[in-house]
Amino acid sequence: MALTADEKTQIINEYATHEGDTGSPEVQVALLSKRIADLTEHLKEHKHDHHSRRGMQLMIGDRRRLLDYLKRVDINRYRSLIERLGLRR
């Protein structure tokens, strides 16, 4: 369920804006999106796992705030990221 180190490294390398980038909004949103997708699959089987559901809702809020920030700062990077991740907006 948790991201393995290899998965995390692969996502970071794919969405990094420069070498050694682990904190840009793009990387953070991509990592959150992967964790949200994994939790969504978990919750399809375990419908009464409310603790995990709340954690997922908090992650969705974090991702929303990061996307709002990116949209406010650089609309082109925002649009590119939304398209690459396949998020609805």
Curated annotation (Swiss-Prot):
Ribonucleoprotein is among the record's keywords: yes
GO biological process terms held by the UniProt record: translation
InterPro entries in the record: Ribosomal_uS15, Ribosomal_uS15_bac-type, uS15_NS1_RNA-bd_sf
Ribonucleoprotein found in the keyword field: yes
Cellular component annotations (GO), alphabetically ordered: cytosolic small ribosomal subunit
Coiled-coil ranges per UniProt: none
SUPFAM superfamilies reported in the protein's UniProt record: S15/NS1 RNA-binding domain
Pfam families: Ribosomal_S15
Database matches in SMART domains: Ribosomal_S15
Keywords, alphabetical: Ribonucleoprotein, Ribosomal protein, RNA-binding, rRNA-binding
Gene Ontology MF, one: rRNA binding
Homology family: Belongs to the universal ribosomal protein uS15 family.
Matching HAMAP family: Ribosomal_uS15_B
Subunit structure: Part of the 30S ribosomal subunit. Forms a bridge to the 50S subunit in the 70S ribosome, contacting the 23S rRNA.
Function: One of the primary rRNA binding proteins, it binds directly to 16S rRNA where it helps nucleate assembly of the platform of the 30S subunit by binding and bridging several RNA helices of the 16S rRNA. Forms an intersubunit bridge (bridge B4) with the 23S rRNA of the 50S subunit in the ribosome.
Protein name: Small ribosomal subunit protein uS15
